[in-house]
Amino acid sequence: MKFIEENCGVFGIYSKTQCADSIYQGLDFLQHRGQEYCGISTFDKEINHITHHGRVTNLFTGEELQSLTGTWGIGHVSLRDRQPMKWKTRVGEISVAFSGNVINAGELMEDMMNRGKSFYKGYDIEIISKIIIEKGDVVSGISALSEKIKGSYSLVVLTREGIYASRDIYGFRPLILGGNSESYAVSSESRAMQNMDMEIFRDVAPGEIVLINAKGFQTVKQLDSPRKAHCAFEWAYTASIDSIIDGVYVQEARNNLGESLAQRDIDEGGIVADIVAPVPMSGVGHALGYHKRSKINYQDVFLYNRYADRSYTQITQVAREKMAKRKLSVLPYVKGKKVVLCDDSIVRGTQILNKVKDLKKAGAKEIHVRIACPPLMYPCAFGISTRSEGELLARKYVKTGNILSMEQLVDLEAQIAQKIGADSVKFNTMDAFVKSLLIPRDSLCLQCFDGISPCKL
């Protein structure tokens, strides 16, 4: 099975005026979803198209943006490949960008190659595009994705008719509609539109295909959706804290997760600490929630380097460790303090180990690590950067992948605390985690925690 280290974001806009600057701005607000590649396509009689290796604001020049003429277009930020991808087809030029992961990419590519199709590198975006192109029209092509693809996708397709936006039938990855008097937009996160003076209209429904043009938003097809399976990791980590995903404020969900951790400490006899602190920036919302419930003073213990990339979305472990070191430096205030340190999750354990080590080296008296997510037990098949069971720290201690009792969880926490050098470690239980997200359990994908896929793989 293939597990792509993938985080990415899409943005599209149909405007009354030239749109390239707006797409550039929208992608900048989605940059946290992927920093390795970026691209913009616009339509003006034909598709204008530019992609880069690197960050949006570092690479697109004013001259390039001026060359991207047209009043509607799409953009993409990614960890893995260049998107959007432009195609000449029998229905005219199109450009395609998506967020997600095609699990059965190898099988689909082999089938297409046996039928005479060629591929550049076999990227998921090539497979998705070719499935769309094989059909007589874009709507039929997007519809065919639900029949052929195992995995997740939220996508935008640029055409002469406008922009088609669609979400897979489970709604794994977010996709939001919004706009103002000058434009209609679609984005992986609401923050892009909120910060561009746009109103948030609604989420694209699982299986919905929306056409965005001068008339606004038109649902041109609604595919049957077996169930919702929104990625729970969006609220815990992936999405920006100022976004709203499927009707839930990310900030509220993270505050709830922190409060839940504090409540568990209170229920288990309380904890004596001087300060509660986040691992920036992923632990901020959780730490604020913990502070609110516990009444322990909130205090930063790390100085965050805003110019460093997200370490979790770096491709290699060496790159992650180097980036993590660049991101954070310890504040001397920590000396002699008992610290509750909050973060979203423990994946491989390397980064939290180094942070605990740095804090103790700086003189912290005690470090109590509190983690918002339950232990990660399974690699994600649907697009988050975890590749194999062997890389997951919790799985090294729970070989079956199933935590069946509170006693088993407590034992795991003690083993991880010893491994990372912390005085204690606690995770949210699965029940507490789901309750904090304010979304029914049967509307979430929790596969990385419990190994249960919402669809047949």
What spans do the regions from the language model cover?
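Active-site proximal loops enriched in glycine and acidic residues that flank catalytic Cys/His/Asp
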Residues: 167, 188, 214, 278-281, ...
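Conserved short alpha-helical segments that host acidic/polar catalytic motifs at enzyme active sites
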Residues: 1-206, 211-274, 279, 366
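Phosphate/diphosphate-binding loops
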Residues: 192, 199, 207, 263-265, ...
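Short, glycine/charge-rich flexible loops or terminal/linker lids adjacent to PRPP-binding catalytic cores
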Residues: 289-339, 350-353, 377-389
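Flexible loop/turn segments at secondary-structure boundaries
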Residues: 18, 104, 172-173, 193-194, ...
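A generic structural motif
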Residues: 37-41, 300-305, 367-373
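PRPP-dependent phosphoribosyltransferase catalytic core
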Residues: 161-162, 197-203, 356-457
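Feature representing long, continuous alpha-helical segments
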Residues: 255, 259, 263, 284, ...
